[in-house]
């Protein structure tokens, strides 16, 4: 009789590739050989080449998400895309309300809704979870990013760009925060989620004008791309975007292919969604080319309107399609009904709607203003690539956490 431990490594990898990343820990614990193998090799990288693997924040809970964008042909010769699979993370994070999530190098940085003195970093592949203590409580007007330097050492950027600009960096090795000496001549909206690329994070930015009051900054258009370098621990120069985003417009960033960025834009006065991708991205120069442009009005019962931070989207360059997450109004009444949907958009006006989940709102109309961005469904802007990145908790901090919980 063949035992699980007798299976070849290739067959084991084929088996584990069919298991969701968040369930991998439970499966590999059934066999010591599988456990050892998964600790030294990433066993499901091949899976990421054929479908989008990612994480979705829905109703303050973190869910894993699979989305097959390569599809298959039906009898009429048309191409259909498989419906996504969405599952809760199924671990400690289920007990937390997550308001923001960021992704880099196989790690997820989670900002919790209630516990505002600690951040959580999670490696879904290895199952490691690390709690990071903040020097002071955080609030919704702070932005975050996770990345790594040239030595693959991971760090976290935490910043506030309102009234008094402050920038802090957390080093995983020293387990400590440092204040950065940065005097910005630009403004980054902390509600937006940057896009991670090669260990660095890119943001949309506004240029600050001399003697400009804080409340006036938001009325200036977002028209630049700005990179934070985790090696130099500083920001680079401003690079023009292919559009100007004013206060009521929607804009978002995404990364793909390990070396490219995509930018989405929707004017407040239009139902047209435009997406550009970078044709070149270097420290001193960035250039953009159009990728897709689709009018969403014919495909929605009610107005198609993205939140001001652009919500979330991801693209498949090979298939030349984009997936845009949206909240559709199903019926307007005293008990308004909405559904979270994914719009797959392609060339020549192609649009396909995939329902993710339906919900009932008992509080009137859906608010897509700045105050509602935390509970708007978000998908991490790039496909998740598993990694063996280590985030082991230091003994000192773990003992401190146990003492806090005991009290």
From Swiss-Prot:
Name of the molecule in the record: Putative F-box protein At5g60560
Superkingdom classification of source: Eukaryota
SMART domains the record matches: FBOX
Stored PANTHER family: BNACNNG10540D PROTEIN, F-BOX PROTEIN CPR30-LIKE
InterPro entries, sorted: F-box-assoc_dom_typ1 (IPR006527), F-box-assoc_interact_dom (IPR017451), F-box-like_dom_sf (IPR036047), F-box_dom (IPR001810), Gal_Oxase/kelch_b-propeller (IPR011043), SCF_F-box_component (IPR050796)
Pfam families, alphabetized: F-box, FBA_1
Native organism: Arabidopsis thaliana (Mouse-ear cress)
Annotated F-box domain residues: 2-49
């Amino acid at each position: 009789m063949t035992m699980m431990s007798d299976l070849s490594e290739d067959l084991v990898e084929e088996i584990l590739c069919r298991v969701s990343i968040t369930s991998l820990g439970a499966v590999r614990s059934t066999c010591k050989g599988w456990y050892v193998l998964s600790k030294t090799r990433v066993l499901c990288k091949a899976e990421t080449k054929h479908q989008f693997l990612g994480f979705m924040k829905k109703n303050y809970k973190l869910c894993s998400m699979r989305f097959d964008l390569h599809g298959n042909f039906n009898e009429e010769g048309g191409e259909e895309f498989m419906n996504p699979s969405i599952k809760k993370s199924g671990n400690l994070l289920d007990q937390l309300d997550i308001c923001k999530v960021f992704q880099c190098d196989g790690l997820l940085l989670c900002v919790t809704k209630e516990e505002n003195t600690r951040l959580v970093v999670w490696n879904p592949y290895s199952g490691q979870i690390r709690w990071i203590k903040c020097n002071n409580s955080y609030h919704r007007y702070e932005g975050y990013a996770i990345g790594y330097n040239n030595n693959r050492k991971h760090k976290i950027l935490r910043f506030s760009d309102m009234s008094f600009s402050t920038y802090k960096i957390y080093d995983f090795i020293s387990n400590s925060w440092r204040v950065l000496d940065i005097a910005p001549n630009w403004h980054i909206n902390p509600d937006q989620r940057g896009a991670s690329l090669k260990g660095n994070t890119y943001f949309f930015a506004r240029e600050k004008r001399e003697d400009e009051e804080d409340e006036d900054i938001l009325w200036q258009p977002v028209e630049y791309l700005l990179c934070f370098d985790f090696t130099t621990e500083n920001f680079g120069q401003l690079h023009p975007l292919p559009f100007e985003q004013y206060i009521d417009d929607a804009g978002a960033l995404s990364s793909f292919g390990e070396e490219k960025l995509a930018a989405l834009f929707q004017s407040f006065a239009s139902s047209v969604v435009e997406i550009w991708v970078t044709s070149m991205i270097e420290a001193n120069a960035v250039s953009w080319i159009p990728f897709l442009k689709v009018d969403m009005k014919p495909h929605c019962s009610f107005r198609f309107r993205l939140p001001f931070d652009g919500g979330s989207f991801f693209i498949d360059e090979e298939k030349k399609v984009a997936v845009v997450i949206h909240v559709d109004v199903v019926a307007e009444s005293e008990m308004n009904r909405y559904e979270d949907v994914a719009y797959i958009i392609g060339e020549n006006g192609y649009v396909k709607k995939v329902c993710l989940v339906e919900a009932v709102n008992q509080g009137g109309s859906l608010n897509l203003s700045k105050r509602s961005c935390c509970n708007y469904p978000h998908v991490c802007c790039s496909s998740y690539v598993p990694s063996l990145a280590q985030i082991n908790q230091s003994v000192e901090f773990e003992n401190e956490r146990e003492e806090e919980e005991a009290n």
